């Protein structure tokens, strides 16, 4: 395995003592992992939920997933030829964008590909994402799932939520006989439409969790060959 470039001094940005200690800890953990594992993969983790991270960590016992401020992770890798911790490692930083995690592992490339190509979780849609379905709340009594399941299997939405629906979510609701009601069907969004904050909150309120979350892996570094290779696992293709 190629020797590390340990002689380079890297200065982290000025910050408070606790924040600096945390940056130094992450920095040191990255470099220790680089000396321990054969591969390091760049995972794109924008909008990731805590349970997803827990699942991945539990599935990859024996490997190490590190997260932190992107600039700290990049500095630990080395952003230039002169600063890189190992030969050609600086080339990996060009694949670091948004919220990232570094997965260090001795598992084979095929194992990594198979796991992350198969891994998928349903999640609530975020603002600026595309609506997974056309969602319309039927007229009449407003039920907790907004018409997604038969009313015999559902329950009316709690009347205490009516001000939230009317004022925060701008739905034309009223209270009739103690029940939240709509005098006409209310269209929340159409499939493929770009969601605003209000629409995303309404979908969450009615339990619409149909957005698919997948981990994107853009590239990896091989410690033995000192090479960076592009992967593009789960990368969305441009329309």
Curated annotation (Swiss-Prot):
InterPro entries assigned to the protein according to its UniProt record, in alphabetical order: Mrt4, Ribosomal_uL10, Ribosomal_uL10-like_insert, Ribosomal_uL10-like_insert_sf, Ribosomal_uL10-like_sf, Ribosome_Assembly_uL10
Chief location category: nucleus
Cell compartment(s), UniProt: Nucleus, Nucleolus; Cytoplasm
UniProt-listed SUPFAM superfamilies: Ribosomal protein L10-like
GO biological process, one term: rRNA processing
Function: Component of the ribosome assembly machinery. Nuclear paralog of the ribosomal protein P0, it binds pre-60S subunits at an early stage of assembly in the nucleolus, and is replaced by P0 in cytoplasmic pre-60S subunits and mature 80S ribosomes.
Family: Belongs to the universal ribosomal protein uL10 family.
Identification of the protein by name: Ribosome assembly factor mrt4
Organism: Candida glabrata (strain ATCC 2001 / BCRC 20586 / JCM 3761 / NBRC 0622 / NRRL Y-65 / CBS 138) (Yeast)
Gene this chain is encoded by: MRT4
């Amino acid at each position: 395995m190629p020797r590390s470039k340990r002689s380079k001094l890297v200065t982290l940005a000025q910050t408070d003592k606790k924040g600096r200690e945390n940056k130094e800890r992450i920095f040191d953990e990255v470099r220790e992992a680089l000396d321990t594992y054969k591969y390091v993969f760049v995972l794109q983790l924008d909008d990731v939920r805590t349970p997803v991270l827990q699942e991945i960590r539990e599935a990859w016992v024996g490997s190490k997933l590190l997260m932190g401020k992107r600039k700290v992770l990049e500095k630990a890798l080395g952003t230039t030829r002169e600063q890189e911790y190992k030969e050609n490692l600086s080339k990996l930083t060009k694949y670091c964008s948004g919220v990232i995690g570094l997965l260090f592992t001795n598992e084979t490339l095929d194992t990594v590909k198979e796991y992350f190509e198969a891994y998928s979780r349903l999640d609530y849609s975020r603002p600026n994402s595309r609506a997974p379905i056309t969602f319309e709340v039927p007229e009449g009594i407003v039920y907790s799932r907004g018409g997604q399941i038969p009313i015999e299997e559902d329950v009316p939405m709690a009347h205490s939520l009516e001000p939230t629906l009317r004022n925060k979510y701008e739905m034309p609701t009223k209270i009739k006989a103690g029940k939240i009601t709509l005098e006409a069907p209310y269209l929340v969004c159409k499939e493929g439409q770009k969601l605003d904050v209000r629409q995303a909150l309404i979908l969450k309120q009615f339990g619409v969790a149909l957005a698919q979350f997948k981990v994107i892996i853009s590239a990896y570094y091989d410690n033995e060959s000192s090479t960076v290779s592009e992967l593009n696992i789960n990368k969305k293709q441009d329309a």
